[in-house]
Amino acid sequence: MIKFECVTELSELQCLFPGEPFCDNVRYAAYKTEYGGNDFSLLFSLNGNICILERIKSDKNEPSVTDGLLRSALDFAFRRGVDTAVCSLFKFSDELISLGFTQKDGVFSGNTAELLQGSSCKH
């Protein structure tokens, strides 16, 4: 089983994502894990009622790990009352679509509760 660790301290977020422009009035968090000797992390922000999936950092492409990172971030947002998730990370479009994100005008989006159910549960 893969364990995903939540990071909310700004100093640790800055170490995980050096050079990322963190805004003062936005709440950031990340999930990170190690799998098969490779490091993976997902940075996201909560801005009002929207969760923005900002950046995924990985040593290699591992769809099951990416899926776990995305689900962890969605769960974090959902538990804090956030209804909508958005993402512009086209490199991970297969994983986003498999979760149930829809694409419009260059952005993937969806309702956090529905996304946590996954596309296999939708009719």
Give the positions of each predicted feature.
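Short amphipathic alpha-helix that is part of the acyltransferase structural core
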Residues: M1-N25, S119-H123
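Terminal substrate-recognition subdomain of acyl/acetyltransferases
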Residues: I2, S45-N47, V86-H123
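Intrinsically disordered, low-complexity segments enriched in polar/charged residues with Gly/Pro
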Residues: L16-E20, A30, G81
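Sterically constrained small-residue positions within well-ordered secondary structures
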Residues: F22, F44, F76-F78
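Conserved donor-binding loop and adjoining core beta-sheet/short helix segment
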Residues: R27-S64, G68
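Acyl-donor binding region in acyl/amide transferases
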Residues: C51-G106
